[in-house]
């Protein structure tokens, strides 16, 4: 069984021209391109939680991405230790030490994992999920919109590092970014439906029915096909499999597999979401100890020994008036999740980057899901958050229609030029790309000018 990474994963769509005395490895170049991109800088003006108010403490998408990168590099380091191989050795009935020697070389470098974590949110539009839903609704007959798909599009096409290949990142970096290796209009049937509300005033359409599916845009299929060229036909077919068979025409499907690098990035993102977003919500008073009791009860019913032993003390520190005690609790929780990570075998892939993933044990994953659910129920679905997101939805839907009514007059010069040059089928995508790249404040400022 081959467990070596093929050098083809370091290739780029356009071969880099060598620069004098530049000895950086490929993934360090990727990291630099992402860090120096306008899209990455824009994350500082996109809020992670919208209802926390004007408080210097709260996280933006940028600080969130930096924290995800730190957690991601810590997960990679943990995956090198022998205890991370225990479950895999049992799963494969092989010697743990031999597996450790064989598989450590598959792990991403710090440059690579940080590249993925820095880039994972750069395609997300203003106003969080509200903005995503609004753009998906406005693009419903033209391929839809989804934040992760926009990230891939930005990296491979939009960011002006090259004329037509975006940042021109390595194949392995792009593979690690793809969380859902399928096409959006395949995973979701919503783009084919013609519902009566399509002729209604878009400001009052129930946007909850237009949360996007998961996949890449059909416009970006050529780059996706280039990305998957190193895979065998069998691996390509397996990689695009869904978790379930569609039982209802309206059902949104999710793919089953992701690369090793992507599994590490996604786990780091989940930990940051479940723990650090909770910290923000506690500090600014969005959640209190009384609301936490339901989560505390669920946590005490989890079979995790560490949680059983420490959750009462963790709870006391989380809701303490002493900031250092809260930070101590947050650090303990993050450490608990990081040190629990382990290798797992995904399926019978020929490609080793797809054959293995990072995973939490079931009892630890259950704990993380409780944290994530609490943040979702009491922070994301908080009425103040939802009102802000709804306002964002209305702003983006109205602004989209305004731009579409007279694009050559109202779009910025370069965007208007791209709109003129685009095919009839792609003109809406040009407007969508422009709006998806806005920060919250910029979107509001432009809207007020119209």
UniProtKB/Swiss-Prot annotation:
**Keyword Endoplasmic reticulum: yes or no?**
no
Protein keywords: Hydrolase
Organism, by scientific name, is Pasteurella multocida (strain Pm70)
What molecular functions are annotated in GO for this chain? dGTPase activity
Query: Pfam families, from UniProt?
Result: HD, HD_assoc
What's the protein called, per UniProt?
Deoxyguanosinetriphosphate triphosphohydrolase-like protein
Keyword Ribonucleoprotein appears in the UniProt entry? no
Domain HD span(s) in chain numbering? 61-201
Which GO biological-process labels does this protein carry?
A: dGTP catabolic process
Enumerate the InterPro entries for this protein.
dGTPase (IPR006261), dGTPase-like (IPR050135), dNTPase_2 (IPR023023), HD/PDEase_dom (IPR003607), HD_domain (IPR006674), PHydrolase_assoc_dom (IPR026875)
Family per record: Belongs to the dGTPase family. Type 2 subfamily.
């Amino acid at each position: 069984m081959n467990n070596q990474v093929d050098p083809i994963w370091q290739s780029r769509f356009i071969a880099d021209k060598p620069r004098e005395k530049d000895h950086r490895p490929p993934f360090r170049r990727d990291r630099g391109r992402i860090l120096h991109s306008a899209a990455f800088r824009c994350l500082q003006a996109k809020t992670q939680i919208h209802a926390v108010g004007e408080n210097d403490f709260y996280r933006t998408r940028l600080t969130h991405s930096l924290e995800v990168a730190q957690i991601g590099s810590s997960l990679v380091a943990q995956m090198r230790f022998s205890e991370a191989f225990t479950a895999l050795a049992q799963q494969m009935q092989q010697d743990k030490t031999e597996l450790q020697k064989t598989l450590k070389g598959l792990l991403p470098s710090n440059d690579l994992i940080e590249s993925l974590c820095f880039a994972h949110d750069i395609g997300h539009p203003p106003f969080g999920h509200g903005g995503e839903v609004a753009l998906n609704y406005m693009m419903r007959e033209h391929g839809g919109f989804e934040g992760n798909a926009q990230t891939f599009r930005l990296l491979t096409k939009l960011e002006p590092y090259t004329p037509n290949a975006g940042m021109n990142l390595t194949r392995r970096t792009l593979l690690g970014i793809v969380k859902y290796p399928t096409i959006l209009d395949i995973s979701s049937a919503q783009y084919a439906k013609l519902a009566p509300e399509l002729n209604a005033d878009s400001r009052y359409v129930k946007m909850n029915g237009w949360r996007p599916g998961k996949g890449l845009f059909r416009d970006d299929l050529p780059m996706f096909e280039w990305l998957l060229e190193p895979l065998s036909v069998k691996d390509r077919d397996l990689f695009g499999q869904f978790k379930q068979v569609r039982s209802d025409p309206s059902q949104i499907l999710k793919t089953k597999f992701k690369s090793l690098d992507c599994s590490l990035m996604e786990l780091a993102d989940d930990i940051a979401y479940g723990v650090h977003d909770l910290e923000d919500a506690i500090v600014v008073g969005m959640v209190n100890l009384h609301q936490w009791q339901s989560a505390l009860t669920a946590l005490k019913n989890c079979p995790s020994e560490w949680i059983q032993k420490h959750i009462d003390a963790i709870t006391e520190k989380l809701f303490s008036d002493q900031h250092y005690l809260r930070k101590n609790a947050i650090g303990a929780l993050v450490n608990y999740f990081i040190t629990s990570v382990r290798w797992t075998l995904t399926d019978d892939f020929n490609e080793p980057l797809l054959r293995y993933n990072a995973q939490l044990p079931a009892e630890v994953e259950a704990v993380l899901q409780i944290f994530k659910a609490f943040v979702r129920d009491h922070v994301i679905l908080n009425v103040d958050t939802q009102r802000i997101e709804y306002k964002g939805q209305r702003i983006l839907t109205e602004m989209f229609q305004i731009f579409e009514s007279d694009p050559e007059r109202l779009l910025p010069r370069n965007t208007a030029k791209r709109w003129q040059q685009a095919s009839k089928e792609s003109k809406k995508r040009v407007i969508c790309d422009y709006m998806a790249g806005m920060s919250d404040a910029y979107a509001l400022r432009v809207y007020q000018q119209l």
